[in-house]
A protein has these predicted regions:
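Transmembrane signal-anchor/signal-peptide helices with a preference for the extracytoplasmic
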Residues: 38-59
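N-terminal signal-anchor/signal peptide hydrophobic helix marking the start
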Residues: 21-35
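Short, small-residue-biased leader/transition segments that mark boundaries at the very start
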Residues: 1-8
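Non-catalytic interaction surface on structured domains
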Residues: 4, 51, 56, 136-139
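Soluble extracytoplasmic domains of inner/organellar membrane proteins
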Residues: 107-242
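Extracytoplasmic/periplasmic/luminal assembly and interaction segments
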Residues: 81-118
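Transmembrane alpha-helices
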Residues: 11-14, 19, 24
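N-terminal alpha-helical signal peptides/signal-anchor transmembrane segments
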Residues: 61-82
């Protein structure tokens, strides 16, 4: 009987050990699976988030590039218009405002120019999207960010300066044209010597036509265009934009 009890006790101890060992091993194994699963989920989620942020940054930079291209076209248009004012101003100043010493055909080509009032505008909606998003903090290239904010500041300065010229032109030329008689208006529209007799008899107009020739400092306009181009090229290179 004693031997039988010892045999039963030994078997029971083996069963307990086996059960105990299985429980510990199973717990560790299950815990490891859970931990690994959490890590995989976390890493996978992080990779998805990073990939999504990368795509969002690239899409936003593409919008900024397109916006700068549009601003570049507006810049080119207003510069082309201003160059005509500049040419007329240079022509008149070079002849000391003695317009009858200038070939009449040369004056006629500018016959509508004195009534042209323009303004420069630019958009920064795409830049504002970037500034107001969390993406700004995710961009590691801080020099590029400075370049982008810098070019919009350049555009704003150019806008103020260019529109300052056309505001001046508007203030002088609108009252001048409103004060003309019908006969004077007809002569102005022909653009020949008689038109410039009328224009240059007005002191404000005489002073204004001298302005465009030296309105901007040398190479300023070209530098603005170059800065825009450099910003566009930097974006295209950094983010592989087509």
């Amino acid at each position: 009987l004693v031997g039988s009890e010892m045999c039963i006790r030994d078997r029971w101890n083996k069963v307990k050990t086996t059960v105990k060992d299985w429980q510990v091993g199973d717990y560790i194994r299950q815990t490891s699976i859970v931990v690994i699963g959490v890590l995989i989920t976390f890493v996978g989620s992080e990779l998805v988030t990073q990939n999504s942020e990368k795509k969002d940054i690239q899409a936003t930079m593409s919008l900024i590039r397109d916006e700068l291209k549009s601003n570049r076209e507006n810049y080119k248009s207003i510069v082309s218009e201003f160059r005509e004012d500049e040419r007329l101003s240079s022509l008149l100043v070079e002849h000391d405002l003695k317009h009858r010493t200038i070939p009449e055909d040369s004056l006629i080509q500018f016959r509508f120019l004195m009534g042209h009032i323009r303004s420069f505008y630019y958009s920064q909606n795409a830049l504002d999207i970037l500034k107001n998003s969390m993406l700004m903090q995710k961009i590691s290239d801080k020099e590029l960010l400075l370049q982008l904010t810098g070019i919009y500041e350049v555009l704003d300065g150019f806008r103020a300066t260019m529109n300052g010229y056309y505001d001046m032109k508007d203030e002088i030329m609108v009252p001048f044209h409103l004060a003309l008689t019908d006969e004077q208006t007809d002569q102005i529209n022909r653009g020949g010597y008689e038109a410039w007799d009328i224009y240059l008899s007005d002191r404000s107009v005489r002073n204004f036509v001298r302005v465009a020739r030296n309105y901007f400092t040398p190479d300023y306009v070209e530098r603005v265009g170059k800065r825009i181009d450099e910003a566009i090229q930097a974006l295209e290179k950094k983010y592989h934009l087509e």
